[in-house]
Each structure stands twice: as C-alpha cells, then as structure tokens.
Amino acid sequence: MDLPPDSRTALRDWLTEQLADLLGEPLADVRALADDDDLLGCGLDSIRLMYLQERLRARGSTLDFAQLAQRPCLGAWLDLLACADRLSAPATVALPTVQDRDQPFELSSVQQAYWLGRGAGEVLGNVSCHAFLEFRTRDVDPQRLAAAAECVRQRHPMLRARFFDGRQQILPTPPLSCFDLQDWRTLQVDEAERDWQALRDWRAHECLAVERGQVFLLGLVRMPGGEDRLWLSLDLLAADVESLRLLLAELGVAYLAPERLAEPPALHFADYLARRAAQRAEAAARARDYWLERLPRLPDAPALPLACAPESIRQPRTRRLAFQLSAGESRRLERLAAQHGVTLSSVFGCAFALVLARWSESAEFLLNVPLFDRHADDPRIGEVIADFTTLLLLECRMQAGVSFAEAVKSFQRNLHGAIDHAAFPALEVLREARRQGQPRSAPVVFASNLGEEGFVPAAFRDAFGDLHDMLSQTPQVWLDHQLYRVGDGILLAWDSVVGLFPEGLPETMFEAYVGLLQRLCDSTWEQPADLPLPWAQQARRALLNGQPACATARTLHRDFFLRAAEAPDADALLYRDQRVTRGELAERALRIAGGLREAGVRPGDAVEVSLPRGPQQVAAVFGVLAAGACYVPLDIDQPPARRRLIEEAAGVCLAITEEDDPQALPPRLDVQRLLRGPALAAPVPLAPQASAYVIYTSGSTGVPKGVEVSHAAAINTIDALLDLLRVDAADRLLAVSALDFDLSVFDLFGGLGAGASLVLPAQEQARDAAAWAEAIQRHAVSLWNSAPALLEMALSLPASQADYRSLRAVLLSGDWVALDLPGRLRPRCAEGCRLHVLGGATEAGIWSNLQSVDTVPPHWRSIPYGRPLPGQAYRVVDAHGRDVPDLVVGELWIGGASLARGYRNDPELSARRFVHDAQGRWYRTGDRGRYWDDGTLEFLGRVDQQVKVRGQRIELGEVEAALCAQAGVESACAAVLGGGVASLGAVLVPRLAPRAEGSMELPAAQPFAGLAEAEAVLTREILGALLEAPLELDDGLRRRWLDWLADSAASALPPLDEALRRLGWQAAGLTAMGNALRGLLAGEQAPAALLLDPWLAPQAVAARLPDGREALARLLEALPTPAAGERLRVAVLDTRAGLWLDQGMASLLRPGLELTLFERSRVLLDAAATRLPERIVVQALDDGLLPAEHLGRYDRVISFAALHAYAASREGLALAAALLRPQGRLLLVDLLCESPLALLGAALLDDRPLRLAELPSLLADLAAAGLAPRCLWRSERIALVEALAPGLGLDAAALQAGLEQRLPQAMRPERLWCLPSLPLNGNGKVDRRRLAESMTRALGECRDEPSAEEPLEAHEQALAECWEAVLKRPVRRREASFFSLGGDSLLATRLLAGIRERFGVRLGMADFYRQPTLAGLARHLQAQTVEIEETQLEEGVL
C-alpha cells in the first residue's frame, strides 16, 4: 500500500504493524506505546532493527541502520520519515529461484569460511564448526527417539546436505544414520563414567562426514542406575544457533507427538541465498565502499598473551568456562540497560571488550560478531533450518577512565555502524585486506543469543529436560564468547582453544569478566569501568619491588680513596706491562683534582674526560670527582660536530684531553700537565645526592641526551652487585667497556671501590678478542662485565688460544643474550662460574634487574630480565599508565633509589621521561616487557622495535629469537626495510662447526728457481721509470717504493730479457703494466681502476706468475668432473673483476659445472659479468651481505688470493663454510708473502702491508672454523689448501621450514642474508641502524635487477594458466607464491577444483599449503600424475 508522506498517523500505524510482527507482540500493545518510549526496553534488538530497516528500504526509504538506532522510539522515526522521500509499496522485483534443487549450489560466505577451516593446512584448522550438547534424563524410548531424529532430518533439506569442493547439495536420503545408541546399563558405574568421558571427548570434537551428508548425529547412552544421557553433535555448516533451537524443538515434538508437526516450509536455502544476493546488491556495494575506505585504519586482533603460535596447534580442542547469572542479576542488568538506552547484548559485549582490552597489548582491536540474519519475504523463514549467519567486524577502541555508561554507548554506536554495513561481511573485508597487503584477523568472537525464550525450547525440555553441558568449536577462532538464556538466568560461556593461551589465563580473564558484570548489577554505571589488577598479582609485585636498598649513601669515589689509604701498595690497575698501585692512582687523581680546582672548577661543574683507555683516563675520572665536579666522558673519536653539541648541552666548563688549548671552548687541559701539578690533600666533601657523571646517549631526534646520575643513585646499584658477587681484593676485573658506556661505572667504582684490580686493555685493543684472552690468562681475571657481543667475540676464539678458566662470574647486559650462550660459556670457565644477565637503563643507574643463569629451561624464548635489584622497582604499564596483568605486554617503568636526576639541562625531556604518580617517581624506559606469573620480568625489546609491516604488528625480537632457534644460527638481527613498500628483512650469523681435525703436515715446497730475482728485475724496471717521471707521488707511496729498491739493491739480478723468460712474459706485458701505472699516478683514472686492469689487479698478477699459474692449475685439477646428468655447484668468493679466471675458463665451463661468482663490489661484478660467458652466474654481496638462498648450496668454494682482504681471516672462512653443503670442500689459494709486482698496484689502494698468514696459522684457522684442512701443494710464496666441511645443517629450505614452525607467515622475513659477524657500535651493541641501511640497499638492488627466471616448463605453464584463471592476473615466475599474488583460501579451493578438472588429480588443501609456489605445486602435481599413470598401467597389466 502507498503511504502518504503527510499522514503521520498512517506512518505510525504501518510502523507499529511491523514492530508487532518483529517482536511477536499483540498489535494493540505496540500501538499503545508512547512516541518517546525507548523500544530497546521493549525487546527490540539489533537484528530486529536491521529487519525493520530492510522493510523500510524496500518501500523506498533511504534511512540507514545507524539513524534508526540513534533514537529508537516511534516519535524520532516518524520525524525522520517525515523528512524523507515518499514511502511506497515494495517494488515488484523478479527474484531468482533455483530451478533444479537436486543440483549443487554455492556456499554462503560464512559456510565457505567453515568449510575451508576444516582443512589441515589452515591455521587452527583441521576442525569443523561444531556444537555438542549434553542432556541428562530418564526412561527414553530409543526407537521413538531414532524415529524422531529421522523425521526431523526428512523435514529439513539442509539436514540432508552434503558439502564437497566448496559447494553443497541436498541428498534425498543420506547414506549414514543420524542416530547412535549405546547401552551400558550392565557396566560398573565407574567403568561407564570412564567410557562416557571418552565418548564425550570424541564426539565434542569430531568432524562429521559432511561430504556424505552427515551434518547431525543424535546419540543416546543408557547408563547404570537408569539414567539416560542424550547428546547432539551438529555441524554448523548446515544450521545456525536459531536453527539449533528449532531442531531441538522439533525433536521434542516429533518424540512426544509427531502428529502436531506442521507441514515444513517450502523455502529452499539455495533460493534464499540467490534472493538475498539480489536484494542486497546495492547495499553490498555501498557497504564495500565503506569498509574499503576504513581498511587502512582498522585495528587487528586483540594482542592477547599466547602460549604458542596458533599455527603450531595441529589438532585444536576447546574447553568451556561457564557461569550463570541469577534471575535477579539478569533482571537488574536488563533494567539498567533500558535506563541507559542500550541493549543487553551491548552491555555484555562492552564488558567483554573491556576485559579483552585489559589483557591485550593494545586497547584497539577487532571483534568478530555473528548476526543471525533470517530476513526474507517468506513469513515462514523462522521455521527453516540452515545457516543464516552473517559475520561482521566490530572495531573496539576502549578508553581508560571513562564511565561504563559512556563506554557501553560508544560500543553500541560502533556495533550499529557495523550492522549498517553488514551487507559486505567480515570475511570479504578480511580477504580484501589481505589482497591489499594489509592483513587483519578477527579470531575472537562475541556471540549473543539472547532471544525472548530460553536456549532450550520448552518442547524439548518437556521431553528430555534442560541443558546439562555444551561445547562448541570454530576453525581459526581463539576465543568464542556466547550468551544464552537458560532457565530464569543468563548463561555466560567462553570456549577457548586448549594450549593456545598460557595456563590459567582464560580462567583469570573469565573471573574478571564475571566480577565486572556482577559489579555492574549493583552500580549506577557512572563510575570508571576500569578493571583492577588481580589481587594475587598486586601482592606478588609489592613483595618483589619492596626489597630495601643495600647501599649506605655515599659518593662513588669514597671507597677507593679509603682503600688507597689502607693499602697503598695493592694493585689498582694492570695495563700493558705497567702496574699502577692504589696509592699511585690516588695520588694522580688528587693531582688532577688540584689542577682542576686551580683552573676554577667547583662542585656541580661538568668536566669532560676525553682520553684514550689507560691509567690516565681512570685517574682523570677520579680526579674530577675528587674536585667535586661531575665527569662527562667523551670518546676520543667523537665526531667534532657531535662533540660540540654535547659540550654545549652539558655546560662543560673544561675538558681533560691530551692537548693544551686554553683558548678553546671549552678550554682543553693536557692531562700530563695536570699530573705535574700539586695534589689536593683530600677529595672535596660532597653530598651523596650530588651529580657524579653525565653520560650521553643517542636521541631519537638526532640530538644526544645527557643522563645525569647522582652518586647515591649509582652506588645503590653497585652495592647490590657487590653484595651478590662478594668482590674483594683477590678479584681482577677486565674493563672492556668504553668510558662513555655506563658499564664502566661499575668497573671503576664497583671494582676499585671493593679492592679489586682492573685489567685495562689499551685503546687499540678495544675490539681485539685475542688481546683480551691473553690478558685474562696472564692476570688471572676473575670478573667479566660487558655487552653480550663482546663475550661472543671472546668465545669465538678456539679454546686452545683462549683460556678463561680463571673467570668466576660473568656479567652481561645492554643487549639480547643468545639462549645457547650459557651452554657455550660454561665449559670455558672455572667450575662454579655464574652467568648474571642484567638489564635496565642508563637513566636508572647502570642496572635495575638481575637474572642468574645456570641452565636454560626449554620454555624460555630469551633470557628474561629476572627480578628487580634491591632498592629498585619495576612496573609494566599500558598506554594510560595502568599496571597490566601478568603475561600482558606493556612499557617497563623503573623506580627506586637508582633513578637518575634527569637529562642534563633539559627539563622538558626530563618531565616527559621521568614521571610522577601516586606510586612515586618513575622512568619510562621505552622498553616492552611483561611479568610472568611467577614474578619474573621478561624483556621484549624496544617499543620502537615493535613494527608494523603491511598492517601486521611484529616484534623484531621474536623474529630474531625464531632465527636463533635454528640449528646452525649463532645470532640474528631483524629490521624493517625501507625503499618503497616496507618489508621485513633479517641478517643471521652462521654458527661455526666444532673444531675440525685435519692434517697439519706440509708437503715440500715446489722450487721456482730464479723467480724472485726475475720478478725483482721487472719491478725495478717499472719503479725506476715511475720515480724518474714528473709525477706527483704520495709521500708514503714514494717512501715504500724507495725502501723496496734499497732493500733489493744488493741482490744479484739477471738481465731483463732473462727475467721475462723466467716469468713467461712478453716485453709487451711489462710495457702495459708500466703504462697502466703511469696513467693511474697521473690522475687519468681513479686508483680503484687498477682492479679492472689485467696487468695490475693483484689477483690477475698472482695468476700470471709461474707459481700462481701452477697453483691455479692444480686448483682446477682438484675440481671433480660431474658424471653425466649430475651437477657440480661451484662458488668463487671475492672474485673481483674475474680477470684471473681467464686462464682456467675452459676447465670452468665443462659440462655439468655451475659457476657462481660472489663479489662485494658491484662495479667489479658488473665488469666480470660483461666479460665472462652468460652461463656464469654473478651475485653481489652488498655491504658483505650474502643472500641466504646460497647457504649450504655449493659442492666446492674457491678462494684465490683473496683471504687477506678480510679484517680477520676467520670472517672469510666463516663465509666459505656457510656456502658449503655437508661434505663440500673449500679450495683455497693463499699468499704466504708479498709479491713485488703485486705490490706495485696494491700499494695504490692501501699503503699498509698485506695481512698474510703463515701456512701453519692458516691451517689452524681453518680447523677452528670447522673445516678439516689439508695442504695439497705449496711453493715458497703461495699455497693451495683443501678443507672439508662437515656442514652446518643450514640452508635456505631448512631456515624456511624452521621459521614456518615458529612464526606466522606475516612475521617471516621477506629476505634473509648472512654475515660472518654482526657489526657493533661504540658501546659493543649490535649496530641495528647500520644493518637496516645495508639490508635496504641490498633489497633495492635485488628488486632493481631484472628477473633471471628461466622460461616456465610445459607443465608449469599449464598450471600457471589455472592460477591465472582464479587470480585474474598473469603468472610468470616459478617461485611466485599463490598467496603473495593475492590468493586466499577460497581462491585456493577454486584452484584445486580447476586442477582436478584439467589434470584429473585430486589435491588436498594441506598439499597446497606445503607447496604454495608455482614450481613447488608443479613438482608435486607431476609426481602425483606419474603415480596415477603407473597405477593405471599396473591395473591394465593385471
């Protein structure tokens, strides 16, 4: 009927008719409602409101759901409609119907998700969407019950549906029964109970045979004592929750009085799906635009604590937590909801979201909300059993400190906004997000089933009683919240995946949820809805953070001067061969203090100390403190601009250096001049609260920030460690940390203050592990204190060269400690040596927490922070400064007696980072961490190390831990790479194999008579001409050449022509070399161009000399010839321009030999690629980064006269070992002494002598690198060594497989590289910024290079066509991943159907997930095809 827009009465009558129909209330009662009555209090919920909106839209209304939900009362709606267009009768639209109802039809989007989720390859898959219900009753008639089950199955087509290949089909009669009977009445009670528990566990988690039409199964177990246990197993592919209620109701009627069952409705589910799509096409298009616009801003799943990666759970099982609100509690909540204008479902949903936010790292997340959407024109739609569910995404952005009334209204507004756009369902939104490279997930479900009636219909209760228990499970769902009316109350149920969450976490969260709801029953909702920390957790943290300080307040330097007075002759410092006693050091310090006082230094002033490591540096620090000032340590290599920034920011009044410059700003005083001056009688008295030092750390803005620490703060930390370690005069501490790194504070004032001696490495030994090892052994060092990377360097030395058995305690801090490090350290140290891992911040007095490590438990992902030190406290807080529960990640705040005063002369930054609240003063570390449930603190990396890549939150520390867990990986560093689309990359350091046993015997050196003399003749000839030419030579270069000429002057040398004959050279070669050198020296080309010159490049020169030619020939002979059909993969390290390869090219191009050249310079590599045959592969090592796909790939690795190019030979050997497969061999030609001719060119590049090893040392280095060496041949100047690799067990496939077990796909690095060692910054920490820049450059080069893919094989091309059909895009690369090209699970299902149709091979989803690349799937498909052909052939023969 038409509704005139000017007739408010007619509009009201029509609205009340619709409401009466939707609410199931008498029309007279609805018409009696006032215009301002809140309809939510009358039973109107979101679903019914959505149905009303659709009815309005069918009559031409443009009102959306949100408008109707904003003021749900008749008067407001009439006002809105009065302003809207004329309403009319629904337009007559030809709705589609299914012609042949016996044919398969498509699944709905929700059914697709459930169907795909059953696959074993899905995360938390291998399980059906399933409900199991249990009832306990008596005197059931099995025959009548079986007949009732079959009756209901025949009434409803979807109870006879089979599901296959992503489609569904109605069967006339499924082959499997829908009833199961077990009679256990004769069993003992305990035996029957055991059997029941086993049966219940099986049936509650079973996957029904839906492919054969078994979608539900009704069971009866007859127990001893007359009890009957009735159970129902239902696959929710065929029925939603409302359908479950209908199924129960009809089972009750069919059992008690089947004649009362009405004729079933004629509506077919296929018709419904087709009609709904047609009716909602316009709304779906609008909703799609809405969600795509919101996509970049959508949050992700709740970041709840997990016990394991979801994909690691192969066979999910669920368990239920349940609580029933009483009738009184339920009524009070309903009354309060009506008073605040919200639905009861919104109340429960908001409370659920608040609990999730409390236990989530982020208070912004997505919820998955099912809508049971049965709207259709057929009035009997409510009598149809099928799955009418629509899933929608609900954005939750929970705010702290707001009242519950405000929170629930905000929640409801968001819910209504989502419902308004439900025509584009959640699954489509998530698929679109994945296609756009912004994957999201919504594995937490909020389902509300609060109908007017109870969950179990009266008809069923009359026959069998009420629900005893229930359990549900859904693929890909972590936690499923459900609400039901049961009896007079409301049942709250959480179904969660067993083993996914830490033990006890769901129970703790559920307890908080129930407690919140019970408090809401008795409150006005106007107070903040914050959830308190569980009481037991509060008590435990109070105990941990309440340890009293160990320190007696005093200055840092007091104890040392007291000890110097008590025992002046005791050793204080051991440096090189010097021994500085306490008395001598104290006197030097007081002399420096006297000089500073004379220069005008007064208490509180800042004095810079910028000296090389050594006794003078230590004396200067004590001297500054003795003068009453605070010291500002600056490295001697500090860049001038940064030095000026720090000096100005700190207000440095003068600097102690190795030069005198009184006019400089600040003035510089020579430490030697200060030491010659008079000494103070005693240190200037100072209060412990005075500033002791200012250490500058890097600032995020690029401006260094100076942490100002008082004496009292630092001494509190130091005393805690001294108390732990019991340091005394017998101890010797190796001081490897730089003065501007705060670990040195403990070395100086903890070590010397307790009476220990400091062993000081010299400035040039700052990164020399061999020098440290020598010092440890010589001085019997007992204490080690450093960043982990420095200890790793020390442990990399072979035990035969580094004896650490004097160490009794090792302190590590400042960076991640590898989990295997304690096990590698233990056998190298004294028995009983303890490893103490510390953490904290410079802003909190060196350290604030301690974890002593003996053994590493298997559940540790990293070495935890442990417990707070005495006098210090830790909090883990959220973004609002609230303490978060155990296991929840938050920001670490440090409090207590060791806090710094703040940032020097920067009150604004100090106020931001040092905060005050009701619990005291706290330093906000910017670190992420959490408390375990035993009170242990776990450090999880910097806040700025948690990154987002393609919308996915990623913790770099977790990626690194997963890499380090791989066999053969020593350490790793992950980073987000720039350069266009952000991606994740990582560098790993391979672990060297254990020391290898090889042969140290040396063959007799092959003589080359007259070679040295002949080479000297040519060298003198060239040098003489160059030195006489009018060329501007560098003084160092001229001196080096003249020195050589002088050294060789006394030698008796042959004539030039004889020298050329001995070398096998032509005179033209000599001329070419001289001309090339002359051009370089004249500036016609850059010195680096000599590496491209065939007569000057050092490797090329070595290969032209007789002994080099012989070594190269023997190396090539050592390469085996591949058998027919086999391949020999050969890698050449540090190829340079490959000029030396020319002499062996024919041998290297033999059939079956695959040659790959590796080079760190792209210029040289490009030159090699241009010159050499196309079949030779070239690979750049940008910044030394080796792409991980080359790990463990090669049968032979060649290094020709290149090992000396590495800073340490072990780095080159580690790289070679990483390239080799197990039992592969390194063929190494190395120079044993300099060649004069090679010196001509090399001196232009580097005026330092070449780092050449003696042959026994080289063999020892090979053995230490895990390579078993054998010298094959040698001359006096060059040697050929073969080394066998046991293999690291490390290759690209193994790495990928290991990462797949530990990390979800979004967290796996796109690219992996290998380095012999990670670069360190000045403080001995991994230089992450440098690595990220290197990886970004390397990635950019990789992306810029044209694809080297070979053409697709015929079977790959055929498969690619199948891919293109479903992906709607070209597929050209064999290593392309289906998912990276935009594929998803639904498209994969269609692809597998297409493969079956084209190739006749049935592949499972698990096969596809194992082989997601074109090449991998093609190989698998080819193997399956061959197997089928062989089977068919065998059958034909038989």
Curated annotation (Swiss-Prot):
Domain of life: Bacteria
Known EC number: 6.2.1.69
Any one Gene Ontology BP term: amino acid activation for nonribosomal peptide biosynthetic process
GO molecular function, one term: phosphopantetheine binding
UniProt keyword list: Antibiotic biosynthesis, Ligase, Phosphopantetheine, Phosphoprotein, Repeat
Catalysed reaction equations from the record: holo-[peptidyl-carrier protein] + L-cysteine + ATP = L-cysteinyl-[peptidyl-carrier protein] + AMP + diphosphate
Pathway, per record: Siderophore biosynthesis; Antifungal biosynthesis
Gene Ontology cellular component terms for the protein in this record: cytoplasm
Cofactor(s) of this protein: pantetheine 4'-phosphate
Annotated stretches, region: Adenylation: 563-950
CDD domains documented for this protein: A_NRPS_TlmIV_like (cd12114), Cyc_NRPS (cd19535)
Gene3D superfamilies on file: 3.30.300.30, ACP-like (1.10.1200.10), Chloramphenicol acetyltransferase-like domain (3.30.559.10), N-terminal domain of ligase-like (3.40.50.12780), Nonribosomal peptide synthetase, condensation domain (3.30.559.30), Vaccinia Virus protein VP39 (3.40.50.150)
Record-annotated Carrier domain positions: 6-85, 1350-1425
Annotated region described as Condensation/cyclization, given as residue ranges: 136-442
Residue numbers bearing the O-(pantetheine 4'-phosphoryl)serine modification: 46, 1385
Family named by the database record: Belongs to the NRP synthetase family.
PANTHER family: FATTY ACID SYNTHASE, NONRIBOSOMAL PEPTIDE SYNTHETASE
Entry's free-text remark on domains: Modular protein that contains an aryl carrier protein (ArCP) domain which bears a phosphopantetheinyl arm to attach the activated salicylic acid, a condensation/cyclization domain involved in the cyclization of the cysteine, an adenylation domain which activates the cysteine residue into an aminoacyl-AMP ester and a peptidyl carrier protein (PCP1) domain which bears a phosphopantetheinyl arm to attach the activated cysteine.
Functional summary from the UniProt entry: Involved in the biosynthesis of the siderophore pyochelin. Accepts salicylate activated by PchD at the first peptidyl carrier domain (ArCP), and activates and fixes one molecule of cysteine at the second peptidyl carrier domain (PCP1) via a thioester linkage to the phosphopanthetheine moiety. Then catalyzes the condensation reaction between the salicylate bound to the first site and the cysteine bound to the second site, and the cyclization of the cysteine to form the salicyl-thiazolinyl-S-PCP1 intermediate at the second site.
Name used for this protein in its record: Pyochelin synthetase PchE
